[in-house]
Curated annotation (Swiss-Prot):
Keywords: ANK repeat, Coiled coil, Repeat. This is Ankyrin repeat domain-containing protein 36A. ANK repeats lie at residues 31-60, 64-93, 97-126, 130-159, 163-192, 196-225. Residues 1383-1466, 1504-1531, 1573-1614, 1727-1814 form a coiled coil. The keyword Repeat applies.
Amino acid sequence: MEDGKRERWPTLMERLCSDGFAFPQYPIKPYHLKRIHRAVLHGNLEKLKYLLLTYYDANKRDRKERTALHLACATGQPEMVHLLVSRRCELNLCDREDRTPLIKAVQLRQEACATLLLQNGANPNITDFFGRTALHYAVYNEDTSMIEKLLSHGTNIEECSKCEYQPLLFAVSRRKVKMVEFLLKKKANVNAIDYLGRSALIHAVTLGEKDIVILLLQHNIDVLSRDAFRKIAGDYAIEAKNRVIFDLIYEYERKRYEDLPINSNPVSSQKQPALKATSGKEDSISNIATEIKDGQKSGTVSSQKQPALKDTSDKDDSVSNTATEIKDEQKSGTVLPAVEQCLNRSLYRPDAVAQPVTENEFSLESEIISKLYIPKRKIISPRSIKDVLPPVEEAVDRCLYLLDRFAQPVTKDKFALESENISEPYFTNRRTISQQSAENLDAACGIDKTENGNMFEDQNVDKEGKALPATGQKANVSPEQPPLFTHTVKDRDHISTRFLGGMDSLTSSEESSERPPLSTLTLKEADPSSKAAMRRKDSPPPGKVSSQKQPAEKATSDDKDSVSNIATEIKEGPISGTVSSQKQPAEKATSDEKDSVSNIATEIKKGQQSGTVSPQKQSAWKVIFKKKVSLLNIATRIMGGGKSGTVSSQKQPASKATSDKTDSALNIATEIKDGLQCGTVSSQKQPALKATTDEEDSVSNIATEIKDGEKSGTVSSQKQPALKATTDEEDSVSNIATEIKDGEKSGTVSSQKQPALKATTDEKDSVSNIATEIKDGEKSGTVSSQKPPALTATSDEEGSVLSIARENKDGEKSRTVSSRKKPALKATSDEKDSFSNITRGKKDGEISRKVSSQKPPTLKGTSDEEDSVLGIARENKDGEKSRTVSSEKPPGLKASSAEKDSVLNIARGKKDGEKTKRVSSRKKPSLEATSDEKDSFSNITREKKDGEISRKVSSQKPPALKGTSDEEDSVLGIARENKDGEKSRTVSSEKPPGLKATSDEKDSVLNIARGKKDGEKTRTVSSQKPPTLKATSDEEDSVLSIARENKDGEKSRTVSSEKPSGLKATSAEKDSVLNIARGKKYGEKTKRVSSRKKPALKATSDEKDSVLYIAREKKDGEKSRTVSSPKQPALKAICDKEDSVPNMATEKKDEQISGTVSCQKQPALKATSDKKDSVSNIPTEIKDGQQSGTVSSQKQPAWKATSVKKDSVSNIATEIKDGQIRGTVSPQKQSAQKVIFKKKVSLLNIATRITGGWKSGTEYPENLPTLKATIENKNSVLNTATKMKDVQTSTPAEQDLEMASEGEQKRLEEYENNQPQVKNQIHSRDDLDDIIQSSQTVSEDGDSLCCNCKNVILLIDQHEMKCKDCVHLLKIKNTFCLWKRLIKLKDNHCEQLRVKIRKLKNKASVLQKRISEKEEIKSQLKHEILELEKELCSLRFAIQQEKKKRRNVEEVHQKVREKLRITEEQYRIEADVTKPIKPALKSAEVELKTGGNNSNQVSETDEKEDLLHENRLMQDEIARLRLEKDTIKNQNLEKKYLKDFEIVKRKHEDLQKALKRNGETLAKTIACYSGQLAALTDENTTLRSKLEKQRESRQRLETEMQSYHCRLNAARCDHDQSHSSKRDQELAFQGTVDKCRHLQENLNSHVLILSLQLSKAESKSRVLKTELHYTGEALKEKALVFEHVQSELKQKQSQMKDIEKMYKSGYNTMEKCIEKQERFCQLKKQNMLLQQQLDDARNKADNQEKAILNIQARCDARVQNLQAECRKHRLLLEEDNKMLVNELNHSKEKECQYEKEKAEREVAVRQLQQKRDDVLNKGSATKALLDASSRHCTYLENGMQDSRKKLDQMRSQFQEIQDQLTATIRCTKEMEGDTQKLEVEHVMMRKIIKKQDDQIERLEKILQHSSLMLQVFES
């Protein structure tokens, strides 16, 4: 039975390969234990105490690495555990399975022991070999009390290894519902995941456990969690076809999203009311970062509000930055503060069930964005609400209010119908202000006119108590319409809607001009305590926005519009948009209103379209009303079937006795990427009020960053006003820095505004900077317009800007129409003719048109009219055309009129058969009366690249004020960037008007930096304008800068036109500084713009023109330029004024650009005016065959009877430097005043740089007028540049160059020397510390100009007076043509390189996809491997059980057979009993017969008859009795036999059936396993190729073996010589060998007899072998050695021959020596056996005992013992040889001796058997030693094998040695010395071979293990 128990216990490897729960108990064997372990096992407490008192190590381990504490816990002995713990036994030691005593106690449910361990500080978080803690085993055992104790003692409920489940997941995987419920109550992490990302819900779904699923759903588990295979629980439910569980998950998900708007609104807001009739609020900065990876979401919204106190209202509009990052084609939406009662659950859609959206569906949803907010309010219109609601209701019924999972697609027809229904009722069918009085409007809007002008709105109730519709929605409310609900949603309305296609966020925040803003702002007089202006803060990093505002005091209000920052980051297809809008009104005697910025950015990717139409109409009547049309900002971005809409609108009303109506400017930028269209519309409105109005327009900064479809933007605006008696106006500085690095963009915008108030009006025009960059076939168009009106008893109207951007790609169209109309008011009407720009671009049969019309009237006896500036930029690439027209017109007023005709500049560039023409015309007419008309300015630019068209229109209009008008035309900068079919346009216009008294106005610095890498372009436009007024009008014409860059055959044209007009009195103006810094760094850009303006006024104005520093540094083909132009005029009664310094620093690494712009201005007034035009320096850098063109034009008129004008000097510098070019141009101008003005000619610096096929063209025109009774007019300069491919020409400049200054070249050199001083001035500015970081790297060396460029400059300087003829111009043209040809050749080379780069990128993308796929496959394989391992373990266990069943069945079968045999023997016994009865019966019959005969003779006849009759009767009775006996016996026997047979048959049949079933099951299982094994073997074949490398390593080891063999060969050669002599002797002995053959035959017969005896002994040894098998591995092998020595002589002979052949191949010579040595040994041993059997037996016994002792220590010692035995045998063999010589002489005696030897051998065999018995008896005593030596068994095996081989060889060669006895006797003496040496060497070689064999075996095991691992991984 003990053997049976041992078989049940698995080995350590089997236990480790199992699941860890199969064999909880320890296999205990006596010889494994030590003293302390035995005491614990037997429960001998006293002995344990004794051992511990004697300082016995309590932590001592037994042979299975177990401590006494392990055994005490396993056997459940708390007393032992307490004693051991009290003796400070270590509690956290581990056994061979890495299990602590605590784990063992919990596993075996020994709660008392476990509690003792926990109370004494045992660590419950230790994991065992399987990665499980004690908590896992407690869960497995479902022991709740144990779990509670473990948790109470600090067990980590989530502790596990990487490859093991957490306890909760473990309970779910084991289907333990109670444990799952218990753990969830104990706050286990319900969303925990395993190493494959699977949650508990996924496990429960795969197992089909409905109860567990319900439990998990009750604890709010994340049903959208995805595992490593990107699947959720619903997917597994679908795969398992488990409808019940799927319905549970679906119902839970539906309910969760139904409750989301009420319970899960992720918005926190704080409100504090305003105190003491005033309220100031700072809206919070809402930063929403939504990152979704692998289907997970994270959203955060925070909003905080703080009020200010006392008579002041300071409001900071919130800046909402939304950064949405989407990866792995997932979509993320962030829900900002939700509107109450929002859209009946339509806005919150589950992401998991989101379906892709088609193009038609998108077109519907893009319309729904505007619909959601239009109809849900009261419309003050003669038409009923039915005109608006029906289409909206249809759309809502179809899309928004349907269930999330069942939204229906919308067809194109339906979309067309809905788009018409929205635009017409909402925009055209509204009541105008003329049909309503102001009171009615206020009443309808719910405006409460109080002293404080505060409008508080509660939920659905305004301050007046007027009930409002409780819709909970905030819609797009028009100026005539009251809001449906008031501001109750945390002062801001953020709506996030997710449409069908995925998680698209739509945020809209809009207000009407008639109701208070969402933040419930109030408007009141400024408090004197708020005089100090807040300092500007540096622009925050990307993703953050900071805005600061301070209002001015007394009868003025400063209202700032919100800064809407939309940063959208899109990765790999998803899109997310967020919009934040803020609204602020201004009231009481003055109103400051800022027009909202409407930015509509529609980005469509993958064949989807987005169209936005926003028409606006406004009229003015009676008491001038101020009306604002709501701003609709819709940013609809769709990528990868997803949509994201963003809507931002800002509205600010102003009221009380005056109203100003400003139409919105609708800017539509359409971006197309991959056949998609994107539209962006930005409009700004500014009204004029009675009294004075301080108005700051909002800064709308839209930074769109795309990185592989990702966007990121940051906007920072700061506003600061100035106070009293003077007005200082700084236009906002809009800096849009778009950085693209590897397709990524980062934009930062900072703007600061400072208004000045009181009896003066300070008006700031908004700077709308839209930087749109498109990469990979995207287009970006941005249009920004700003308009300031005139104030005080006059009406200023600005004509509408109609920008139509139509882009068609792949048959898709996107149209946007924006119209604005303003009528003329009161006694005067000024009409501006509409400016119509029609741009038609065709690509693939597509047409796009744009129309822009503007009409402004002028007021009161004078009319000032400025036509709109329409810039349409068209770029044609690859056979397309490019034209640019720029015109600017300023009017003159009072007794003089100046009319300027439009300047039409048409630049047409063609590459590959295209032409480029440029026309620049300048016209200046003079007019009488008081009409000044300025014709419209039309710029038509057409850009086509790969069939894509983009247009931009920018118009700016300023009106005249109060008998005088001061107008500054806008600076229109159009920067176009094309990269690989991408286009980017930016239009910026700014207009400041002149105001009462004296006004110093600084125009905003517009810095637009755009950088693209790999075919991307950058442009930056910066303009600054300051006007001054005093009973005179100063006009500055707009500067239109059109930069066109064509890449891959595109051309660059620059047109500059300037027009000055003369007016009365004197005026000083400062022209804007246009700073354009363009840098490229592998697609990265960094731009910083800082502008500071400080005005000073005192009847005089001194102007100092700006210093423009543009420094560009490039590494590896980058350029650096620095241009500075300082101007210092002489003044009388001088008041110095420093204008703002815009510094643009663009730093780039690996092609970085650093630019610094410094602009300083000082004006002076009083009867004299010194006017200097700004120096516009435009450096354009083109990399990778890109072109950049920038044009800056400035116009300044001069008045008072004289006008002096200087023409510009054009300097063309071309620098070529290997990779880096740095140019410095320094123009200085100084003018003198007082009656005579000195006229200076502006510098036109054109720097053309060619580096690797790059072009950069820059033109700088400056016009400076002078005064004093004379007017000089200059004709316009017509510049026509035509570029052809292979033959190109350009005419960059045709200008009148009169009165050239000979000192220009000297000034250039002086400026270069003075440039460091200018830098010091720039660095001294506090506001520029952050911006000038990269400007310090600007090079001041002017010697980098190449000789050719200098020669060109000298030619221009020399011929400046003679440039009217064409000869000189042709010379200049020829120089340009040469350079252009070189550039073109390099462009072609760059194109080829680009193609290669694109191919490489495509390959890289393909490889990345493959890598990702392989990684997924690997993860799947790992998962399958683990499952297969578990299956294999389970199969092994099943096979073992089946084997046990078979054994049991066989035993039963044998028992049945024995019973059958017993029954058969009983039958035989009964048959034997019946046999003797039969003869007795026969003898009785014979006696009867004889008796009858006798009776007849004796008796009489009567008696005879009687007797006969009686006899007959007796015989009959006897016969009957016999028959009865026989029948009874037979019946009994038959019954017995039948019963027995039936029982036996039944048993037999049952056994046969059981056997058949078992056989069938085994066959099935074997077939299944064989199929699996076949599959595994097939996979193994694939892995064999991988093993070749490992085989190579094995071959290396073989080479090492060969090196050892070489050494052996050398030794063998030495031995060959010694053996040669021995061979000769052997030949001599051959004769004697023949004689001995007869003796050999006899010996063979004896050997056969001995072999039989050995076979018998062998059978006995096998029996002993089975017994030794359980004793230990060492004893087994030793027993085998002795068994094989006697049993396998013949087998070993055949094996020896094979071995000899193996050795002969490699060791021919060595083997012969070895054979001889073995022969001698065998002879000696045999002789010893024959003569001294007793001595041999004793020696062997001693040697065996020594060997057993030596096995424990060393294997080498045993080998030496064997050698000692061999030597002793040799001595005995010598004596035997002498006897054998005598035997040869006497054969008869030998025969007798052989017979004796046989008997002796039999005795020897018996002795050996007795010795073995003794050894076995001693084995029990040596078990402990053998266990200790088990670790050395591997080494002993090799030694034993060697000894076996020796013994086999000795016995196999026994016969041969007998034949050669006579020969060996003679040679023994000679060979003894040699043999000893050989033996020593042989032993050494054996050791070496053993070591090598061990190494080889280890390597083979490692290879096998690695191959198995590879197979497992690949399977």
